[in-house]
Amino acid sequence: TTWSRGLGDVYKRQNKGGCNLSFAGLKTAILRISSTLKSKQEKYDLAASFQKTIEEILEVKTQVAFDEFEKTIGKKERAFVIAGGVAANIGIRKKLIKVCKKNNFRPIFPEPKLCGDNAAMIALVGLEKYKVKKFDKLDLAASPRLPLDQKAKFLKGAGVRL
């Protein structure tokens, strides 16, 4: 199809090395492409391509992480925890189990019913902040990169603080 190249470009950008990743470019590509599609079948195909692209990116990034683990930690007992909303996705689970088996890691998943919503994790952060009387003003801007530790040093491009 004419739009699959756009997803391939996002895939190539994500797999330039390292463990950092962002799906912002993929989300933008999907939104741009979906606005041009007319038939339901094209939309179904795009959704399937979106799923497959995410699975492949996570497979590659997990392999990179396992390789880094091997270099820095060695051959200790290996367990890989997959949690959050991503762990509820059957296709992603299968890909990550495959990578775990290939690298002798034991995959650990919560039950699917515990994976579907990040609200519990957000509530836990709220509870922890409440316990130490750390309150934000009501005009706090929403940010997908808002760190839990506001004092941490920002790492440009990584979307994380250490």
Predicted segments with their positions:
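A contiguous, well-structured pocket-lining segment that forms one wall/lid of small-molecule binding clefts
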Residues: 9-80, 87-105, 130-133, 150-162
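Glycine-rich phosphate-binding/hydrolytic loop that grips phosphoryl groups
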Residues: 110-150
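Single conserved hydrophobic/aromatic residue that forms the stacking wall/gate
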Residues: 1-11
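Active-site metal-binding loops of divalent metal-dependent hydrolases
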Residues: 84-86, 112
